[in-house]
């Protein structure tokens, strides 16, 4: 299996198989698919990844990339099938389970999403710590949507302790506290968010709305 040239594309991570000067046709189609994905041309990306699979059906990375492209279009069931095929071919458990979690999240099947994210976290191994923390954030979001606010806070606090994307994480943590009707903790989190970036419009807007609804807290 080839797992070089990891390409970040928005919220999703696409795996690119190693491409050499004498690369086979599948690799060329895969490369074009990655370029299409990065340009937001997801429909063409799907076509190109399928073409790469036809040319090299045993290359697991192509199935993983296809799953990501399906996810980007909202075709979550097709994405899950592609990620499952990548796993069956011995593909990267981390990227496949991460993608499956995102797909289940899109289907609002949050328990399955959390399970997939957990499997991705366990498979992170020696990958850069930001890869694992990224998935912890997705798991926190899924727990919040499931109504497991305590579990969501546990994940977000782990990210805060790690110093990971603090502005965004404080904002999201404040949102969870609001759902729990803990206005004081929510205000604390939003203030932390603004202390990091005083240009954060969302943070100011949320604080303003809280003060409007809770005038005695001024």
Where are these predicted regions, by residue range?
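Helix-start (N-cap) detector for alpha-helical repeat units in TPR-like alpha-solenoids
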Residues: 26-27, 60-61, 93-95, 128-129, ...
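Canonical tetratricopeptide repeat
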Residues: 31, 65-68, 72, 99, ...
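Residue-level detector of conserved catalytic or cofactor/ligand-binding positions
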Residues: 207-218
């Amino acid at each position: 299996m080839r797992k070089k040239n990891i390409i970040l594309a928005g919220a999703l991570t696409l795996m690119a198989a190693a491409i050499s000067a004498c690369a086979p046709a599948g690799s060329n189609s895969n490369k074009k698919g990655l370029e299409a994905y990065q340009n937001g041309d997801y429909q063409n990306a799907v076509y190109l990844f399928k073409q790469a699979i036809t040319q090299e059906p045993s290359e697991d990375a192509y199935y993983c990339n296809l799953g990501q492209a399906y996810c980007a279009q909202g075709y979550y069931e097709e994405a899950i099938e592609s990620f499952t095929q990548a796993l069956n071919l011995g593909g990267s458990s981390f990227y496949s389970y991460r993608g499956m979690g995102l797909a289940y999240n899109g289907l609002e099947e949050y328990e399955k999403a959390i399970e997939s994210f957990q499997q991705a976290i366990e498979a992170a191994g020696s990958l850069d710590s930001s890869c694992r923390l990224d998935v912890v954030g997705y798991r926190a979001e899924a727990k919040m949507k499931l109504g497991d606010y305590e579990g969501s806070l546990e994940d977000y606090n782990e990210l805060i302790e790690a110093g990971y994307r603090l502005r965004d994480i404080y904002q999201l943590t404040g949102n969870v506290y609001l759902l729990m009707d803990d206005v004081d903790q929510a205000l604390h989190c939003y203030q932390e968010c603004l202390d990091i970036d005083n240009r954060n419009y969302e943070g100011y807007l949320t604080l303003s709305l809280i003060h409007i609804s809770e005038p005695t807290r001024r």
